[in-house]
Swiss-Prot record:
Associates with the EF-Tu.GDP complex and induces the exchange of GDP to GTP. It remains bound to the aminoacyl-tRNA.EF-Tu.GTP complex up to the GTP hydrolysis stage on the ribosome. One of its GO terms (cellular component) is cytoplasm. PROSITE patterns: EF_TS_1, EF_TS_2. Disulfide bonds: none annotated. It comes from the Bacteria. Pfam families: EF_TS. The lineage of its organism: Bacteria, Bacillati, Actinomycetota, Actinomycetes, Micromonosporales. Residues 76-79 are annotated as: Involved in Mg(2+) ion dislocation from EF-Tu. This is Elongation factor Ts. Signal peptide: none annotated. One of its GO terms (molecular function) is translation elongation factor activity. The gene is tsf.
């Protein structure tokens, strides 16, 4: 006969976040000793975290606090929408914004109330039963607009964008910058301006464009113009200021911003499961 009650099992679950069967087994093994049961669960959790390390954390959410953005990954969308997972992400991004860290590595090495963030994530992994990864963290200075996108109403945000801007910084300016953040979320630019594209990337695009044109048997005299056109198409696809604006596809983003009196100086885009 067990020397603990259903209320004891519930209390242990509430205290540790462990499942009902795990809590019951721990109390049975501990012969009703509450502190020993907690220790048993902590040991089991630590072992399970090690087993989970080889699994893939491809789900999760993007959280923000003011001018900071964070991506926290888990294994299933079921966990991604739980209150405890959402709360952990929010706690971490708020701490990151306050503490002055600038990367996920720095955030993991920092402490919350004396406990290391890496240890806190590992503890939550043990409680939840899935591999958790604090994948990315970024923070911008100055005036910043934010946009978060949900891929389904019952899921937390999976895409997050921060846009740092100058110029018109009133309510209208914020609306314009947020519109650009929505463009970034949807169109996935990799660079802000042509000047930000590494020279080796441009050169690679030129080589590919020329090789493709030759394989298509294009006239030799036409190659320079064809190559230039295809490189410009690359810029229009991957450079924010060169993209067609989603609000007016007859104008590039740079023209829309110039007319609005807003200048984008930097942006950050996180999407769950993508680099």
């Amino acid at each position: 006969m067990s020397n603990f009650t259903a209320a004891d099992v519930k209390k242990l679950r509430d205290l540790t976040g462990a499942g009902m069967m795990d809590s019951k087994k721990a109390l049975t093994e501990a012969e009703g000793d509450f502190d020993k049961a907690i220790e048993i669960l902590r040991v089991k959790g630590a072992k399970d975290v090690g087993k989970r390390a080889g699994r893939t954390a491809a789900n999760g959410l993007v959280a923000h606090s003011g001018k900071a953005l964070l991506e926290l990954n888990c294994e299933t969308d079921f966990v991604a929408k739980t209150d405890s997972f959402v709360a952990l992400a929010q706690q971490l991004v708020e701490h990151g914004e306050r503490s002055g860290v600038n990367s996920a590595e720095e955030l993991l090495a920092s402490k919350i109330d004396g406990k290391g963030v890496a240890e806190l994530v590992q503890e939550q992994s043990a409680k939840i039963g899935e591999k958790l990864v604090l994948n990315r963290f970024a923070k911008l200075d100055g005036t910043v607009a934010v946009y978060l996108h949900r891929k389904a109403q019952d899921l937390p945000p999976a895409v997050g964008v921060l846009v740092q801007y100058t110029g018109k910084t009133d309510e209208a300016g914020d609306a314009d910058a947020r519109g650009v953040a929505m463009q970034i979320a949807a169109m996935r630019p990799q660079y802000l301006s042509r000047d930000d594209v590494p020279a080796e990337v441009v050169e690679s695009e030129r080589r590919i464009a020329e090789q493709t044109a030759r394989e298509e048997n294009k006239p030799e005299a036409a190659l320079p113009k064809i190559v230039e056109g295809r490189v410009n198409s690359f810029f229009k696809d991957f450079v924010l200021l060169e993209q067609a604006s989603v609000t007016d596809n007859k104008k590039p983003v740079r023209q829309v911003l110039a007319e609005a009196g807003v200048e984008i100086t930097r942006f950050v885009r996180f999407e769950v499961g993508q680099a």
